[in-house]
Swiss-Prot record:
Gene3D superfamilies in the record: Aldolase class I
Entry's localization field: Cell membrane
Source species of the chain: Actinobacillus pleuropneumoniae serotype 3 (strain JL03)
Protein name (Swiss-Prot/TrEMBL): Dihydroorotate dehydrogenase (quinone)
Membrane topology: Peripheral membrane protein
Gene encoding the protein: pyrD
Function: Catalyzes the conversion of dihydroorotate to orotate with quinone as electron acceptor.
Residues reported in the UniProt entry to bind substrate: 62, 107-111, 168, 173, 242-243
Classification lineage: Bacteria, Pseudomonadati, Pseudomonadota, Gammaproteobacteria, Pasteurellales
Catalytic activity: (S)-dihydroorotate + a quinone = orotate + a quinol
Record's GO cellular component terms: cytoplasm; plasma membrane
Cofactors required: FMN
Catalytic site: 171 (nucleophile)
Length: 335
């Protein structure tokens, strides 16, 4: 069934196909029946109860429009966003490119979204009863030295409506954003956001975990530095990781020359290495959510065995369809 749907979708350019899929899932979310069953493979992470360990990665549903539709595919959790304080168009089109031979995707979207207020309203309307994470970022026009302001604005607005909040400082498509992963800039950001989280937990009388999303392109030394900051500031979890700027796995393939972040199967080895290195540095101090290149039960289990407690998928679903989510959710064994 999905092979036919995929043929139709792949007649469109990547972004048009994505937008069509979001609208179809938005419609499916309103139907009174499940598209696919919710596989029960429960796990507790960050004090939250997940029906299964397979989540939708951020970037798929930037505005939270299709939460109920994605929920009907069997995801144990859904992360919406990345969202910014005000709406922005993102980078010029075309900005999404398929690498068919490798089942990869390059995007340089640039946090295109309708703004945090629209996302919050969509989350409030959603009937999905799984875990919802909200991924927050900064507007492109905000100077990097004022990035904290944007993260604080978003954190305050989404806190009441999220089960956990992810701070995205690792997209390669917003100028200078990745500099927040290093040294004093990271320290200042984590310290301030942790303080804000504590204030909000008192205000709403409920603690919501704070998660950091990092890049797979970090060196071992940089990973160690990030891990140290996560532990010192008592951050609740880390997503490893975002898209890569490396083209080593796709050299010579059609569309590999485009600028942007590479995701999908070509990212698998790099993301597993990030998880493994991070796990050694953290030594169980906080959970890792594995993301990047998961395209089979074997590749997903490899990330669990490397140290991840949960997994997120997006690009592989574009190539393989929702059956992948069902297989992962049923067969992944969390240690």
């Amino acid at each position: 069934m999905y092979s036919l749907i995929r043929k139709c979708l792949f007649l469109m350019d990547a972004e048009t196909a994505h937008n069509f899929s979001i609208q179809a899932l938005k419609l499916a979310g309103k139907l009174p029946i499940n598209v696919l069953p919710m596989p029960l493979n429960p796990v507790e992470v960050m004090g939250l109860q997940f029906k299964n360990p397979i989540g939708l990665a951020a970037g798929a549903d930037k505005n939270g429009e299709a939460i109920d539709g994605f929920g009907k595919l069997g995801f144990g959790f859904i992360e919406v966003g990345t969202v910014t304080p005000v709406a922005q168009d993102g980078n010029p089109k075309p900005r999404q490119f398929r690498i068919l031979e490798a089942e990869g995707i390059i995007n340089r979207n640039g946090f295109n979204n309708l703004g945090v207020d629209v996302l919050v309203e969509n989350v409030k309307k959603a009937k999905y009863d799984g875990i919802i994470g909200i991924n927050i970022g900064k507007n492109a026009v905000t100077p990097i030295e004022r990035a904290l302001d944007d993260y604080q604005i978003c954190l305050r607005k989404v806190y009441e409506h999220a089960d956990y909040i992810t701070v995205n400082i690792s997209s390669p498509n917003t100028k200078n954003l990745r500099t927040l992963q290093y040294g004093e800039a990271l320290d200042d950001l984590l310290r301030s956001l942790k303080s804000e989280q504590e204030s909000l937990s008192q205000k709403f009388n409920r603690y919501k975990p704070l998660v950091l999303k990092i890049a797979p392109d970090l060196t071992d030394e940089e990973i160690a530095s990030v891990a140290d900051g996560l532990v010192r500031h008592k951050i609740d979890g880390v997503i490893a990781g975002n898209t890569t700027l490396s083209r080593d796995p796709v050299v010579g393939l059609k569309n590999a020359e485009h600028q942007g972040g590479l995701s999908g199967n070509p990212l698998n080895t790099l993301s597993t290495r990030l998880i493994s290195t991070l796990a050694k540095e953290l030594n169980g101090a906080l959970p890792i959510i594995g993301s990047g290149g998961i395209h089979s039960v074997a590749s997903g289990q490899e990330k669990i065995d490397a140290g991840a407690s949960l997994l997120q998928v997006y690009s592989a679903m574009i190539y393989q369809g929702p059956a992948l989510i069902q297989n992962l959710a049923k067969h992944i064994q969390v240690r």
